[in-house]
């Protein structure tokens, strides 16, 4: 497929003028590899290295492991689709966002491997969005979106068949494939069997206010660790008796990147999701 036609289709299907983002201000160290358009608006085509796209790989972050696994395949004229153009690692706070390795980016350019990013557009409520696909994986019946974020609505409310937070936690762990955290600030019973979901980093007062307004007592997100940055959010959750379940940034957002495989298949492209490692310290 002509690369420009693929980029145009992604633009049409996901990006609209109401959405914004700010990645470029943190990415000066890799500016030599970044497209001018991405420097201006922080979404869409990150690295313009291909005229043809024969295969797409999807991933949550462009980690060294993900980039190397693609290079090890010895393929050319392909695209890496990522939810983030940088790599999250809370263990390296305050510099939690690490940039792509320049040596690997040079090899991407030589191999004609482009990089494409949808962050806010993929967080935005829709068929392929992060929270929608996490909610689906949890077996929730999605009711409505919430949580304004850079022009998007990044969260969803859904109905669960489970009656207690403990049951929901067990389901959450089976879905993400590892232990999850629970900050139990209210009763174990899930009020009205309604759950709020924000994949990734929903542990902030702005997001929790939307949960509290609906009277919801169970909230699932990715980054839930209690630290200096999140103390006010945890205090707010305690005051409003909101139980917070955390499953890591990576594990809660991977379902959207897996769902995007179906999107690219519909365009007639060969596609593969590349799994990565969750940072358990997120919880």
Give residue ranges: language-model regions.
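Active-site catalytic microenvironments in core metabolic enzymes, especially phosphate/sugar-handling
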Residues: 1-283
């Amino acid at each position: 497929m002509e690369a420009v036609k693929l980029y145009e289709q992604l633009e049409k299907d996901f990006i609209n003028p109401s959405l914004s983002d700010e990645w470029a201000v943190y990415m000066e160290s890799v500016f030599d590899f970044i497209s001018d358009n991405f420097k201006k608006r922080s979404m869409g085509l990150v690295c313009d290295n291909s005229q043809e796209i024969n295969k797409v790989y999807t991933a949550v972050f462009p980690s060294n492991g993900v980039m190397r696994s693609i290079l090890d395949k010895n393929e050319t004229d392909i695209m890496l689709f990522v939810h983030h153009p940088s790599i999250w690692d809370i263990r390296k706070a305050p510099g939690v966002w690490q940039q792509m390795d320049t040596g690997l980016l040079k090899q991407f350019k030589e191999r004609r491997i482009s990089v494409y990013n949808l962050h806010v557009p993929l967080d935005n409520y829709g068929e392929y969005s992060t929270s929608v696909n996490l909610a689906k994986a949890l077996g929730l019946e999605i009711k409505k979106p919430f949580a304004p974020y850079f022009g998007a609505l990044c969260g969803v409310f859904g109905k669960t068949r489970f009656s207690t937070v403990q049951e929901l936690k067990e389901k959450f762990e089976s879905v993400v494939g590892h232990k999850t955290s629970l900050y139990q600030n209210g009763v174990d019973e899930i009020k009205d069997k309604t759950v709020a979901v924000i994949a990734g980093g929903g542990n902030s007062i702005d997001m929790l206010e939307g949960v509290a307004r609906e009277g919801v007592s169970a909230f699932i997100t990715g980054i839930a660790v209690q630290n200096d940055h999140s103390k006010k959010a945890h205090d707010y959750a305690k005051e409003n008796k909101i139980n917070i379940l955390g499953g890591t940034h990576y594990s809660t957002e991977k379902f959207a990147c897996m769902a995007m495989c179906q999107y690219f298949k519909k365009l007639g492209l060969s596609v593969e999701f590349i799994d990565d490692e969750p940072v358990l310290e997120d919880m």
